[in-house]
C-alpha cells in the first residue's frame, strides 16, 4: 500500500473521541419507530427540527424563491454560473440584518465585514489559519464542543489550552482560571494568539454573562496581541433573547469601537442551529479587521456557499414578518422541549445544570457513577450506548474536569421519541438503584456476620482468660 501524507495519517483529527465513537455506534443501529424500535436513539446530535413546519409553510407560499425564479421568470442560468467569492450582495445584506435582529437590534452589522463559509466548521478553521501559525495556541473555556479538537487543530496545527471551570460556580469563566491557562501556555512555550468561546455555550446551554465577557475584554485589552473569537451560532436558540449578550455589544457599551481592540474581536455565525439548516452549509465570519476579511475571503474559495442556497435564503431572511415570527416561535418551542427533558430527568432523580439556551442540557449523572473517576464515566457511557441504546456525549469528550457530566440533545426528535428515551433512562436508574440496594444489603449482612464472629471470638477469649486466672488463683 502506498504511504499517504503525514497529515492524512496523523491522529490529531480528534475522530477517536467518544463523541464520534457514539455516532458510529448510532449509525450501525439507528432507532426507527417502525423499522428498528430497539435501535439507538440519537441524543448526541445538536440539531433543531422543532420548526420545520414554519419553514415548509414559507416555502409553499414563496414558490419563486423555492423554484429559483424572479417575478415568475427563471434565474437558473444566472445561478448556475460562477459567482464572485464575496457572495451575493442580496444574501449578505439579508444575513447581516438577521444577525442584528437575532440580537434584539441592539447592534448592527456591516455586510462588507462578512465572509461566507460552508458552515461554522469552515469559519472557525479559516479564522485559525488567519490568526495563528502552526504551534501557536488558543485558550478555550471547558467544557467545550468536542469537534473543536478537529476543527481548530487538525489542519492548522494550532494547539488548544483549556481554561478550566467547575460545577461549584456553574462552570463560569473566572479571571484566575483565565490567567492560569495563559501561564500554563507560557510554561509549555506556546505563543497564545487568542481566546475562543462559544456563546451561548456548547455543551452547557448557558449564555456568557456580562461579568465573564468583561473579564475576557479586560484580558485582551491588557494583552495587545491576543484575539477574541466568539462562536455565536446558538444565538437564536436563547429562550429569552435579552439574556444573550454578543461581543459586539460589549465593544459598543464599553466604548471600545475606536480602539485597537475592535480589530481583534471576531464572530462566527451560521444558520445551522438558529434556522435548523445544517444541510445547507451556511456559515460566516464577521470581523472589523479588513486584513482578516481579505485573507478569509481568499480562503473561502475552498468552501463556498452555493448560489442557489444564497438566492433562496436571501428571500427568506428578507421576509421580516417571517423572521420575527420564526425567532419568537423557535424560542418558545425550544423552551418547552427543554423543560420536558429537565422535568423528565428530575422525575427519575437526575439533575441538570440550569440553562437558558441551546439544543441540549448538561446533565449531572455523577450519582450513577461507581466511583468518582473518568474510567467510571466511560463505563456508564458504554452502558448507556450499548445497553440503554441512547447516544449521549460524555463530559470527558468535552474536556470537562469533573467526571459524571453528559451532554444530552433534545431538539432533533419528536416528543414520542423523547418520552421513550426518558423511559429507557428510568430503567437504567432503577437498575442501578436496585443493584446498589442489593450491594448495600449484602454488605450489611457481611458486616453483621463479621460482628457476630468477632463477638463469639471475644467471648471465647474472655472465658479462656477467666479460666486461666482462676487456675492461677487456685
Curated annotation (Swiss-Prot):
Species: Arabidopsis thaliana (Mouse-ear cress)
Cofactor: pyridoxal 5'-phosphate
Alphabetic keyword roster: Ethylene biosynthesis, Fruit ripening, Lyase, Pyridoxal phosphate, S-adenosyl-L-methionine, Ubl conjugation
Function: 1-aminocyclopropane-1-carboxylate synthase (ACS) enzymes catalyze the conversion of S-adenosyl-L-methionine (SAM) into 1-aminocyclopropane-1-carboxylate (ACC), a direct precursor of ethylene.
Organismal lineage: Eukaryota, Viridiplantae, Streptophyta, Embryophyta, Tracheophyta
Recorded family membership: Belongs to the class-I pyridoxal-phosphate-dependent aminotransferase family.
Binding site for substrate: 47, 85
Segment forming the signal sequence: none
Biological pathway: Alkene biosynthesis; ethylene biosynthesis via S-adenosyl-L-methionine; ethylene from S-adenosyl-L-methionine: step 1/2
Residues bearing PTM N6-(pyridoxal phosphate)lysine: 273
A single GO molecular function term of this UniProt record: 1-aminocyclopropane-1-carboxylate synthase activity
Pfam family, one: Aminotran_1_2
Stated name of the protein: 1-aminocyclopropane-1-carboxylate synthase 4
Tissue: Expressed in roots, leaves and flowers.
InterPro entries, A to Z: Aminotransferase_I/II_large, Ethylene_sulfur-biosynth, NHTrfase_class1_PyrdxlP-BS, PyrdxlP-dep_Trfase, PyrdxlP-dep_Trfase_major, PyrdxlP-dep_Trfase_small
Other notes: The stability of ACS proteins, and the regulation of such stability, play a central role in ethylene biosynthesis.
GO annotation, biological process: ethylene biosynthetic process; fruit ripening
Amino acid at each position: 500500500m502506498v504511504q499517504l501524507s503525514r497529515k492524512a495519517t496523523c491522529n490529531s483529527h480528534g475522530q477517536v473521541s467518544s463523541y464520534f465513537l457514539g455516532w458510529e455506534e448510532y449509525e450501525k443501529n439507528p432507532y426507527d419507530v417502525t423499522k428498528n424500535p430497539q435501535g439507538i436513539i440519537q441524543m448526541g446530535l445538536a440539531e433543531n427540527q422543532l420548526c420545520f413546519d414554519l419553514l415548509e409553510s414559507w416555502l409553499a407560499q414563496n414558490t419563486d424563491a423555492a423554484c429559483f425564479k424572479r417575478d415568475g421568470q427563471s434565474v437558473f442560468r444566472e445561478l448556475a454560473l460562477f459567482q464572485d467569492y464575496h457572495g451575493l450582495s442580496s444574501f449578505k445584506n439579508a444575513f447581516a440584518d438577521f444577525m442584528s435582529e437575532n440580537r434584539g437590534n441592539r447592534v448592527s452589522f456591516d455586510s462588507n465585514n462578512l465572509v461566507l463559509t460552508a458552515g461554522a466548521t469552515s469559519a472557525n478553521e479559516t479564522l485559525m489559519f488567519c490568526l495563528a501559525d502552526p504551534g501557536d495556541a488558543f485558550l478555550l473555556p471547558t467544557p467545550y464542543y468536542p469537534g473543536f479538537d478537529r476543527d481548530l487543530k487538525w489542519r492548522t496545527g494550532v494547539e488548544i489550552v483549556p481554561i478550566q471551570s467547575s460545577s461549584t460556580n456553574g462552570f463560569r469563566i473566572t479571571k484566575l482560571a483565565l490567567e492560569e491557562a495563559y501561564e500554563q501556555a507560557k510554561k509549555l512555550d506556546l505563543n497564545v494568539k487568542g481566546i475562543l468561546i462559544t456563546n451561548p455555550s456548547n455543551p452547557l446551554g448557558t449564555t456568557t454573562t456580562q461579568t465573564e465577557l468583561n473579564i475576557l475584554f479586560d484580558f485582551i485589552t491588557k494583552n495587545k496581541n491576543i484575539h477574541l473569537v466568539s462562536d455565536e451560532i446558538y444565538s437564536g436558540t436563547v429562550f429569552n433573547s435579552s439574556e444573550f449578550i454578543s461581543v459586539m455589544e460589549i465593544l459598543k457599551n464599553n466604548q471600545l469601537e475606536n480602539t485597537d481592540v475592535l480589530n481583534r474581536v471576531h464572530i462566527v455565525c451560521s444558520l445551522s442551529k438558529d434556522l435548523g439548516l445544517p444541510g445547507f452549509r451556511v456559515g460566516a465570519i464577521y470581523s472589523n479587521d479588513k486584513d482578516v476579511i481579505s485573507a478569509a475571503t481568499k480562503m473561502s474559495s475552498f468552501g463556498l456557499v452555493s448560489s442557489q442556497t444564497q438566492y433562496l435564503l436571501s428571500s427568506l431572511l428578507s421576509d421580516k414578518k417571517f423572521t420575527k415570527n420564526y425567532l419568537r416561535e423557535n424560542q418558545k418551542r425550544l423552551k418547552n422541549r427543554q423543560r420536558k427533558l429537565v422535568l423528565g430527568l428530575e422525575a427519575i432523580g437526575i439533575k441538570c445544570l440550569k440553562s437558558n439556551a441551546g439544543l441540549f442540557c448538561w446533565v449531572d449523572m455523577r450519582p450513577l457513577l461507581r466511583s468518582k473517576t473518568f474510567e467510571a464515566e466511560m463505563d456508564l457511557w458504554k452502558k448507556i450506548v450499548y445497553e440503554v441504546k441512547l447516544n449521549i456525549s460524555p463530559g470527558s469528550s468535552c474536556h470537562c474536569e469533573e467526571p459524571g457530566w453528559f451532554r444530552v440533545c433534545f431538539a432533533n426528535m419528536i416528543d414520542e421519541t423523547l418520552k421513550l428515551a426518558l423511559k429507557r433512562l428510568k430503567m437504567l436508574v432503577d437498575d442501578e438503584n436496585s443493584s446498589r440496594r442489593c450491594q448495600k444489603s449484602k454488605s450489611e449482612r457481611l458486616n453483621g456476620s463479621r460482628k457476630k464472629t468477632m463477638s463469639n471470638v471475644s467471648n471465647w477469649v474472655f472465658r479462656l482468660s477467666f479460666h486461666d486466672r482462676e487456675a492461677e488463683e487456685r
